[in-house]
């Protein structure tokens, strides 16, 4: 279990290291992207709650439609009109009125959904798909949020960018905690689907029992009493099933880590990677050579955040539950940054030698 957590933390560290090591971007919003990955695991793997959809699904869809309309209107204004105070005030008015209208249209549906068996459900559920698909969706969620943040905040100075990303991650956690219709909030979501077999099922499978018996044959041969021998075998099967499941997760997580390591190393020594290092070392010189610094910063910001989103989905996959109250900056942001700094110090020392 500790080894699996180390693998997941390694994936998070790779995401932060891409942003800092490749482009010099400080992102203290790792906790928010991790939570979005966990949210993806819930939305993908949990079966839809049909009664909740009948109670308030239409109101939720109407609210989402209003969000799309608001975004399209703002995009139209940004493209059609030149920058001015009137444009700024118009966009602000659209956002404020849009939020109020969206909340007003969704409120009855939200109350109806949260009233549907709140002890067990009280939310819309998900798509009922295998949870491993959530790793891809988690990357899309985190990358999408990073794109929005990057469009607004990447022009800030490094210290302001760090503060902005930290505050936005806290906003994400607050939304996940309080929107019960989407995530059950602090009531948690348990019993998520697993990509690995269940221990109880393994303990009743003949091939697994035979495998455990072969591994522990020398110990079992020391027991002469048949009843005691069977009891010892049952205990070995119980212990072995837990180890087998953890090894299954370790195999899946190792595959992800190896793939990401290969891709990041190839990217680092590619022409694109050399360009990113040039931008990191001297933005003004890279800009003078015709490189689009803003675009490349946005790209690396999205890629690093997407990798963190994958790690967030992996974490919830292993735990089998989603607990929004457990997301804290000390564990999911600053500890990861300590790992990034230690890795950079180690690699710089190795380069000096």
What label would you give each PLM region?
Residues 1-349:
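Transmembrane alpha-helices and adjacent helix-loop boundaries
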């Amino acid at each position: 279990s500790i080894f699996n957590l180390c693998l997941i933390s390694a994936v998070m560290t790779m995401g932060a290291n891409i942003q800092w090591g490749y482009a010099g971007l400080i992102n203290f919003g790792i906790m928010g992207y991790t939570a979005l990955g966990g949210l993806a695991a819930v939305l993908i793997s949990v079966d839809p709650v049909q009664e909740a959809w009948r109670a308030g699904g239409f109101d939720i869809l109407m609210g989402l439609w209003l969000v799309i309309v608001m975004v399209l209107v703002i995009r139209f204004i940004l493209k059609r009109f030149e920058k001015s105070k009137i444009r700024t005030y118009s966009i602000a008015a659209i956002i404020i009125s849009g939020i109020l209208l969206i909340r007003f249209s969704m409120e009855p549906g939200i109350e109806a959904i949260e009233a549907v068996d709140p002890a067990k459900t009280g939310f819309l559920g998900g798509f009922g798909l295998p949870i491993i698909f959530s790793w891809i969706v988690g990357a899309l969620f985190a990358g999408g949020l990073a794109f929005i943040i990057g469009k607004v905040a990447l022009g800030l100075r490094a210290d302001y960018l760090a503060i902005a990303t930290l505050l936005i991650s806290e906003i994400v956690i607050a939304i996940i905690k309080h929107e019960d219709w989407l995530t059950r909030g602090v009531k948690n979501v348990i019993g998520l689907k697993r990509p690995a077999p269940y221990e109880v099922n393994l303990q009743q499978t003949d091939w697994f029992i035979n495998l455990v018996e072969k591994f522990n044959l020398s110990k079992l041969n020391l027991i002469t009493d048949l009843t005691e021998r069977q009891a010892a075998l049952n205990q070995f099967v119980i212990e072995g099933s837990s180890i087998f499941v953890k090894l299954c997760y370790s195999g899946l997580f190792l595959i992800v880590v190896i793939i990401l390591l290969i891709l990041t190393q190839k990217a680092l020594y590619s022409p694109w990677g050399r360009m990113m290092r040039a931008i990191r070392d001297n933005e003004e010189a890279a800009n003078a050579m015709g490189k689009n610094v803003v675009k490349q910063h946005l790209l690396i910001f999205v890629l690093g955040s997407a990798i963190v989103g994958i790690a967030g989905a992996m974490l919830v996959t292993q735990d089998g539950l989603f607990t929004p109250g457990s997301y804290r900056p000390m564990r999911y942001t600053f500890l990861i940054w300590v790992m990034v700094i230690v890795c950079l110090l180690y690699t710089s020392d190795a380069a000096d030698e």
